[in-house]
Amino acid sequence: MVKAIKVMLIPNNVQKTKMFQYAGASRFAYNWALAREIENYEKGGKFISDAELRKEFTKLRHSDEYAWLLNISNNVTKQAIKDACTAYKNFFKGLQKFPRFKSKKRSMPKFYQDNVKIQFSNTHVKFEGFSSSRKANKQKMNWVRLAEHGRIPTDVKYMNPRISFDGLNWWISVCVEFPDCKETLNDDGVGIDLGIKDLAVCSDAVKYKNINKSQKVKKLEKQKRRLQRSISRSYEKNKKGESYCKTNNVIKKEKLLLKRNHRLTNIRKNYLNQTISEIVNRKPRFICIEDLNVSGMMKNRHLSKAVQEQGFFWFRKQLEYKCSDKGIQLIVADRFYPSSKLCSCCGNIKKDLKLSDRVYRCACGNMIDRDFQASINLKTYGEKFAS
């Protein structure tokens, strides 16, 4: 089984400068390749393959104007050109939107490393082209330190290593193949109802609270709002005509705001991962969830912020990944399946059930929490389709 591993890097100032140079060269090569494809299409020419574009780019590298590209590893620009060609082809196949040019200000700095030439130890990683000579290549000072020791295995085959900068820290993500491990699963299954009041309610009566209602998150959200207001006032104060004069204090405040946003994101993602791991580690035979219409829920201005903070897409994505790792069958119920309106005792559908009705009351005498009943109905739905 192929697993993706992402680890934070701790580079020194010289290594940071080199990384930004690599990311800049990767962005330049991507934009150049995309511009060539667009120019060729407008002239009525056929699609240019990435192999042909790489040959053109090699000649460009050796010109006097772009001699600075010779200090960058060839594999960095080569993969960027390939990515641009893939994005361009995917648009015509109808798989994605038309590719955009990467902006220096708005795009995330990132670059590729050759999967054969990259080297890992328990504590460091060696990037291709970071050293000026073979002698310097052997020195530990030219290796970038990893924040988590022993997280990435050594002496294995690596796939698609990517280095990225999120505004605060540098990260490396790499795919590694692990042997498949078969888990002994239980005979019972679990139905999970996702919501806003509580993150998840399981059919075995286990409830996971909404982390956004905790004091820690509320305090960080308050600090975030204050910083946003302060930055907004600073912009208005330093406004000169139609442009803004960004002072050093504004830059400092924006960095603080970025740290708050990262902190909130990490808290929410960590809680989701812990919740999913706890559910999956029970080793049920199957897990059944509902196919939520998240885009439709986001159109409700009263619920959109709460829906966004819950991270339903991330929950489902991680659940799919962890279920496939453990060999658990994941069943997704139809979007129009009435899990909340269906009585778990008599099967009656209460069509006039409102979102404000937190307790389900049926004519048969059944009185139950609506989210808990939805999870029971999802488990029943999963039992029909479980293999």
What are these regions (language model features)?
Residues M1-S387:
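Nucleic-acid substrate recognition interfaces
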